[in-house]
Amino acid sequence: MTTQVPPSSLLPLSPEQLARLQAAVGEFSPTQMAWLSGYFWGMVNQQPGAVVAPAVAAPAAVTITLISASQTGNARRLAEQLRDDLVAAKLNVNLVNAGDYKFKQIAQERLLVIVASTQGEGEPAEEAVALYKFLFSKKAPKLPETAFAVLGLGDTSYEHFCQAGKDFDNKLAELGAQRLLERVDADVEYQESAQQWRQQIVAALQARVPAQSAAAVAVTPSGAVDEITSSPYSKAAPLTAQLSVQQKVTGRNSEKDVRHIEIDLGDSGLRYQPGDALGIWFDNDPALVEELLALLWLKGDEQVSIDGQNISLSQALRSHLELTQNTTLIVDKYAALSRDEKLIALLADKSALQHYAKNTPIVDMVRQAPSDLNADQLVALLRPLTPRLYSIASSQAETENEVHVTVGVVRYDIDGRPRTGGASGYLADRLEVDGDIRIFIEHNDNFRLPANPETPVIMIGPGTGIAPFRAFMQQREADGATGKNWLLFGNPHFTEDFLYQVEWQRYVKDGLLTRIDLAWSRDQADKIYVQDKLREQGAELWNWIQQGAHIYVCGDANRMAKDVEQVLLDVVALHGAMDAEQADEYLSELRLARRYQRDVY
């Protein structure tokens, strides 16, 4: 059958429109033509009041869950940057702090991205412990419908580099989830590798998920990630403040050198909360710089490039490069450069290599294995200088425009030569009162006083771990908090090492500090530590927990914090009539409720 085209005079189309229509419809099948006729009829009849068949709903947009598992803020900042990248790519993203993530919903996740830091001996960040324990428990579900990616942040100066990221990555795969990308393990100088990873993960997610219109993109950050106090000052742009007080607070016969530091914030407007940390930038000891230059037969006036700028080698070593922390990677590189037989042999023994890197400063490694590096080789060998973080020991409710920290000065000898910690030596020996110091606040929403001032508080902090609890008590006093307060503190000797003794005695006298238990490890034949005191008071501890107490632990992550946690588990099991698995779950529930918080390092 031949279709006759009506005379052009009878058509509502111009000859040009008719030609375009005929060219277009030539590509359609009869079925498509029939559908188009109905489509055009619907367009003509879609007038106000007309009944139109409802459009088929578009499939719900897939949401990418982005978990930040941060210890010192780096993972959080990277997660926020990735969130912004995904939003710019018109992808739906839910950014959540690991401590606020409802991990029992993980089986419903389709696209999961984790940015995870590592602390201590390969442990996850404090805010990620509950999620970590759940994934490694019998309750963890299979995840065959989940695709994931992990970025690990760590420090090669530690033996278990990026272990938390590795554990998350391996466990998710073991549970049946599919990798979007291979895991990336980033060192202290993580910016370049993290930037590449961000670009790769955005591309991988774009390939999985169709982009949404700008109006449709959902950004649902949750938890503490986006509640950080805003400030013009940061790690990259620190405040230049002034040192106002530097005072030794241990006795002259003490084995420890602990300094109380007060810094004047002036009218900077810098704000912090009890539980936050102070980041301090420092310069290396000029004497250490000269010693290293002399060992390598370098003058120090050689020009080197640091962050795209040419400066003298001496300036680079003093203000830009890490000299007081050695790593296995540096030992490995230096062994190749120096061709030293002892160092090369050391590389074959992982345990011995770790021990050597931990206990041998860079300058002493160079002394023991002489070499003739040039300036560029030396710069390439070393890592960028990084600031040190100290738990803040004051509340602005009392100190206003000041911030206080408690610093344990690192001092030791290598082959009869005195060595000092980078930042602690700078604060104790080289920075003068009224001198300039570059600082920033590292906010820590995972170490906060309870919102209810009537809630009891248990504070466990031996040594310099007492610092944040000084801030806590200043805040509780200023708030007129009526909740009970219990401090457990320990150090070697009562007469030499009772940090802030007068202040604690006043709090006891005034009734603000309900009870205090002290452990002096060297004042008797048998060593006594805070964990021993805690175990002795197990029944009382359980009573406080039953009354809703919040438990805080600050200090050494490798020994003290682990021992304290074991005591807590034992006390819960004994007095709560639970088995080990139930006690562990109970402690995890306390963590999720923010009733068990740790600031350990």
Swiss-Prot record:
Residues 236-450 form the FAD-binding FR-type domain. Its cofactor is FAD; FMN. NADP(+) binds at residues 521-522, 527-531, 563. The keyword Oxidoreductase applies. FAD binds at residues 324, 358, 388-391, 406-408, 412, 421-424, 601. Keywords: Amino-acid biosynthesis, Cysteine biosynthesis, Electron transport, FAD, Flavoprotein, FMN, NADP, Oxidoreductase, Transport. It catalyses: hydrogen sulfide + 3 NADP(+) + 3 H2O = sulfite + 3 NADPH + 4 H(+). The keyword Cell cycle does not apply. GO terms for biological process: cysteine biosynthetic process; hydrogen sulfide biosynthetic process; sulfate assimilation. InterPro entries: CysJ, CysJ-like_FAD-binding, CysJ_Proteobact, FAD-bd_FR_type, Flavdoxin-like, Flavodoxin/NO_synth, Flavoprot_Pyr_Nucl_cyt_Rdtase, Flavoprotein-like_sf. FMN binds at residues 70-75, 117-120, 153-162. Alpha(8)-beta(8). The alpha component is a flavoprotein, the beta component is a hemoprotein. Belongs to the NADPH-dependent sulphite reductase flavoprotein subunit CysJ family. This is Sulfite reductase [NADPH] flavoprotein alpha-component. The gene is cysJ.
